[in-house]
Amino acid sequence: LQVSPLAFGGNVFGWTVDEAASFKLLDAWLDAGFNFVDTADVYSYWVPGHSGGESETIIGKWLKQSGKRSRVVLATKLGKSMGEGKVGLSPAYIREAVEASLKRLQTDYIDLYQSHDDDANTPLEDTLGAFDDLVKAGKVRAIGASNFTAPRLAEALDVSERLGIARYESLQPLY
């Protein structure tokens, strides 16, 4: 993936920035020569009356209405709690979460799908195997990690190498 040197973080979409302003910001971002847009399924779960997915939904509407999907390197994340047991990096939850994100984003693939947090309760072999399945199915182009410690990232990279499966290609540290 070839990304611009800066990513536009979509955390604000759907709570501090409304849909119309979000569309204008995304248009300006692309017009300025940038291409990398980052969001997460959990944005903006914490706002009263929200259920998560609001940012992805706005980005999806913008992608569909603008026709600019081919110009965007789209990143999203999963794994933080969205309530009702929707949390973690189990293979079953990864499969469920990617389908929900694809639907909200109104696209058939995600360029960079990231683990938003480590999940110590799920073996890395299982998590990375599920991500590998998504890459092979064409639903995800690459995978990344967010909020991982250096030792845990190293362990994940070792697992991927040992098993010959998709590996974390990026690290997004805590803001």
Model regions: which residues?
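Structural motif corresponding to the early beta-alpha repeats
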Residues: 42-43, 65-91
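N-terminal binding-site loop/beta-alpha segment at the start of enzyme catalytic domains
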Residues: 1-72, 108, 136
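Flexible, active-site-adjacent loop/turn segments at secondary-structure boundaries
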Residues: 1-4, 11, 40-41, 76, ...
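Short histidine/acidic/glycine/proline-rich micro-motifs that form metal-
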Residues: 12-14, 42-49, 80-81, 117-120, ...
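Glycine/proline-rich, positively charged
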Residues: 81-175
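Acidic active-site catalytic centers that drive phospho-/nucleotidyl reactions
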Residues: 38, 56, 77, 111, ...
